[in-house]
A protein has these predicted regions:
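A noncatalytic interaction/capping subdomain that flanks phosphate/NTP-handling catalytic cores
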Residues: 2-173, 178, 188-197, 205-311
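Conserved glycine(s) of the Walker
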Residues: 181
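Hydrophobic positions on the alpha1 helix immediately C-terminal to the Walker A/P-loop
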Residues: 185
């Protein structure tokens, strides 16, 4: 091989090495690493993660997610588990022979945003991004969130669909289907209940540690930019349902389990993962109160829930 070609290749390899970047983030007491091999603007595409970045940490690393061009394609591979609609974004999921997964995530226009391959417990993920910067950011964020949700499940961490307020050192999580009014109810608390603070408006993390259940802010807060690196013990969960009157009741642990399960990121077909999630939810349901609030979007509903769940 001519010397100038070897030198040129060495320069290319050195450039790749020097442009590779790794950032560590800590959420809910555990860390995850995001490596960018070919995306020099990677960190700038994750502004909501900045409150969670750490230079050094003793927290266990639950996942390493590496983004590189041409590392993963969008072609079907392995056994197709299904095509899943996640709020208008299609997720194609394939089970690989080694027990890992391949996923291809599409944007709301059904254009591919990211393809990634993970091992069975999502502790190692390799991904490639596609499209313009907006599309790449969408794929980047979704990949990290999925990796965190499913690797975190093995550390008794659940990523849950909820809006969370904080009051007097406790966290109150409002649950329900999209459009139920979770964010609206949180805003009613902020308006009518003094010294209430919003922790997260879409995807907080909850964790069982030493017999205590804690809720944490995360980089994932839906349409509301609320990315707080804070944590509080959980005061109560509240399942919301729109109704002409305001009525609240406390649910037994079995109903609490069912409600929490439907609100938690999970994969039914993955038995080890699903069993771990169910065990964590069961332990949480036995330790935390869950209420069912049928309500209007008004001040009375906020005061009713506050007076009952903070007793």
């Amino acid at each position: 091989m001519p010397a100038h070609i070897s030198t040129q290749q060495a320069n290319i390899d050195f450039f790749k090495m020097t442009t590779s970047q790794t950032f560590t983030y800590k959420v809910a007491g555990v860390s995850f690493c995001v490596c960018f091999e070919d995306y020099p603007d990677g960190r700038s595409m994750l502004p909501s993660y900045e409150p969670f970045i750490v230079k050094q940490t003793d927290a266990p690393c639950i996942s390493t997610i590496t983004f590189a061009k041409d590392a993963v394609d969008i072609n079907a591979e392995g056994k197709e588990i299904g095509q899943f609609d996640n709020a208008g974004s299609n997720h194609a999921v394939y089970l690989l022979p080694d027990g890992g997964y391949k996923m291809v995530i599409y944007n709301y226009d059904n254009e591919p945003a990211v393809a990634f391959i993970s091992n069975a417990n999502f502790s190692s993920v390799k991904a490639s991004l596609f499209g313009n910067k907006i599309n790449r950011r969408f794929g980047l964020n979704n990949t990290i969130m999925i990796a965190y949700a499913f690797s975190g499940a093995y550390s008794n961490i659940l990523l849950i669909h909820a809006s969370v307020t904080m009051k007097d050192g406790k966290g109150y999580l409002f649950l329900g289907k999209s459009g139920t009014g979770k964010s609206t109810h949180s805003q009613l608390w902020l308006k009518h209940i003094p010294e209430t603070e919003l922790l997260n408006d879409d995807n907080p993390a909850i964790r069982l540690i030493n017999d205590e259940v804690i809720v944490y802010g995360t980089p994932w807060s839906g349409k509301t930019p609320c990315y707080k690196n804070k944590q509080v013990p959980i005061g109560a969960f509240v399942k919301l349902k729109q109704y002409p009157d305001n009525i609240i009741r406390r649910e037994p642990p079995l109903k609490a389990f069912a409600t929490l399960l439907t609100s938690t990121s999970s994969m039914l077909w993955d038995k080890p993962l699903y069993d771990k999630i169910c065990n964590t939810i069961s332990a949480i349901a036995m330790r935390c109160s869950l209420y069912h609030l049928k309500c209007r979007p008004d001040e009375e509903a906020a005061r009713l829930s506050f007076s009952n769940i903070t007793k």
